[in-house]
Amino acid sequence: MQNTYDYDDIAREYLGMNVPAFDEIFPKTKKSETPSDEIPENILKYACYNAYVAYKAKDALTEKLKETEMLDIYNNVEIPLTYALYDMEQAGIMVAGDKLKEYGERLKTGIDALEKDIFAEAGHEFNINSPKQLGEILFGEMQLPGGKKTKTGYSTSASVLEKLEPDYPFVSKILEYRQLAKLKSTYADGLAVYIGEDNRIHGKFNQTITATGRISSTEPNLQNIPVRMPLGREIRKVFIPKEGCVFIDADYSQIELRILAHMSDDKNLIDAYNHSKDIHAATASLVFHVPLEEVTKEQRSNAKAVNFGIVYGISSFGLSNDLSISRKEAEQYIKDYFISYPGIKNYLDNSVKEAKEKGYSVTMFGRRRPIPELTSGNFMQRQFGERVAMNSPIQGSAADIMKIAMINVAKELKEKDLKSKIVLQVHDELLIEAYENEVEQVKDILKCNMEQAAHLNVPLDVDVQVGNNWDEAH
């Protein structure tokens, strides 16, 4: 509901009090200037302010939850979830240090080889990581098309380079270099910092950071592993179960599209899911007016982009870029999609209309997201607000369902006195470190609780895999 939940902000907003903020209690002084005996006193002061504000603000915050009709989701989802997240943080996840080191070395070899090729083609060395120097090489020395000069030089953003990539192998090498460098710094080198003495990473899971209600992770962030790249996916191989255990990965299949079917009550989409049809092929059949058995791979791929794009309020411009087609073709795809699924068109239009009237969107379970952008004087901001109004109820409902599933899975594991534990939650998947003699029980617990976390007009489907590392189980 707001950007921060810091105790000093809550004290000011709900209690009308000014209390010292974190930065005031822990000023940014050099270590040599900080007397060692001050640290315990500061920590005590910080803990006291946190506890005092939480205690004093309880009634005011409870009233706010009642007023916004979110007390139920707070009591029945968010509070029970804190225990599941605590257990996950305590459990952590094991990392094979030798494999992580080997992964980093392979990335370095690839980076060095690309660097050598890039310098050879450029005719001299330069700082590949400098947008200014790279821009001069591409658009100044090499005279490639599409260069847009700004005050700081030519733009070398990913979107600019991706347009050049199909025709210029040199640009392809630059993009690959960036990808490998990012993987090395963020994962190969970055993860090593967080490995504890027990060879496990004990990250932090946050339940109130994202606007949609999805869980996020920090220190480290394991949500953004680039799984579309083969080398990106390989980072999952360094995460391993402890001895005597395996990983069980349970992943919701197309949960957001299933929620869209339920919330829109679109008969064609509901029928496709209830008859276990290939949803992307079924969409292609409707949009391209061909029998289901005659749908081509390209048509299915394009329909898949439209299916997932609609959930995120994709524009014809965005779809044309994604599929490398003209904007006119993209407009026709979207138009035909809404003709095929009229319930979805009505639902999305009504979602925007209701959000404009109320000032917020709401999930199936009552979670609200304020959308102030809808009343902005800026056209681009209003468009952003409309996209949020369309996709937040869907994304937020998916987040709520995952949280409910986690609570129920964690509860049943304890009730059955099993030693297996949830160790990760990423996007639509749960990862369990399961003892080998508990595998079948855990698989049943996952599938049952995840598929029964919500009752929709279409079935929730969960894919369960077992493996000796995270990649193998996914």
Where are these regions (language model features)?
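Hydrophobic, well-ordered secondary-structure elements that form the walls
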Residues: S130, G213, D251, A284, ...
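Conserved catalytic core of nucleic-acid polymerases
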Residues: Q90, H202-G203, Q207-T210, S285-L418, ...
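Conserved catalytic alpha/beta cores of large enzymes that bind or transform nucleotide phosphates
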Residues: R236-L260, D271-K304
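C-terminal polymerase-core module
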Residues: T109-K116, A120-S172, I339-N391, E433, ...
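Metal-dependent catalytic core segments for phosphate chemistry
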Residues: D8-A11, E256-F288, R368, P372-R382
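Conserved "right-hand" nucleotidyltransferase catalytic core of DNA-directed polymerases
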Residues: Q2, D6, I10, Y14, ...
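Short Gly/Ser/Thr- and Asp/Glu-enriched loop/turn motifs at secondary-structure junctions
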Residues: I79, N129-Q133, S301, V423-H427, ...
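Active-site palm subdomain of RNA-directed nucleic acid polymerases
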Residues: L65-V77, L81, I401, A405-V426, ...
